[in-house]
């Protein structure tokens, strides 16, 4: 997610959503703990969200993971809706322009992400989908990074060989090591400055790779 997309701090939005939907005012600390619990549950179970039914069940269960931290008796549907209200994704500022520049250079762009089936919806909502040639979500593919198989899915979608591809990601294990093991070249994007690049527009300095 940290390569293309980020999200606004969700705890304040969760508090506002619960207040609006069921009149319950939870504290900031409780909301923060609840979001952490939800994220932990989601990461452990995102592989179950490979279709619409699985995604609905995953969202409901992830919302339920917040309940012990919130200490409230809200309806499950309300809690799930509040969670979805709280998750507000957007692209990092430089990303749309960087993607346009890469496409103008003749490159095919495919997202390979450890995400549920809603990845496609998120890319559309944030305006990135028209700038891409496709996306592979791990929950749909049935395999996650760093496994070679998910990179192979991305290569097939892009219509290129591994030796002709460059993978950019924010995880040394899932992205860099995984991509290299699958035969791709890899660039580590770390927005804290500890990677090869700290923003996607800096990828132009690696143009020799393609």
Give each language-model segment a name.
Residues 6, 20, 29, 71-78, ...:
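Asp-based, Mg2+/Mn2+-dependent phosphohydrolase catalytic module
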């Amino acid at each position: 997610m940290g390569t293309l997309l980020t999200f606004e701090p969700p705890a304040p939005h969760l508090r506002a959503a619960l207040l609006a939907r069921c009149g319950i005012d939870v504290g900031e600390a409780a909301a923060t703990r609840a979001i952490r619990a939800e994220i932990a549950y989601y990461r452990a179970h995102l592989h179950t969200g490979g279709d619409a039914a699985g995604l609905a069940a995953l969202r409901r269960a992830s919302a339920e993971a917040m309940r012990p931290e919130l200490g409230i008796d809200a309806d499950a549907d309300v809690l799930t809706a509040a969670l979805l209200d709280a998750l507000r994704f957007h692209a990092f500022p430089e990303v749309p322009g960087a993607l346009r520049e890469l496409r103008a250079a003749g490159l095919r762009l495919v997202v390979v992400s450890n995400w549920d089936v809603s990845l496609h919806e998120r890319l559309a909502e944030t305006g990135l989908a028209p700038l891409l040639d496709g996306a592979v979500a791990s929950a749909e593919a049935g395999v996650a990074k760093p496994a070679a198989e998910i990179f192979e899915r991305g290569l097939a979608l892009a219509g290129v060989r591994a030796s002709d591809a460059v993978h950019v990601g924010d995880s040394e294990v899932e992205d860099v090591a995984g991509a290299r093991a699958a035969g791709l070249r890899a660039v580590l994007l770390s927005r804290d400055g500890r990677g090869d690049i700290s923003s996607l527009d800096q990828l132009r300095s690696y143009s020799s790779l393609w």
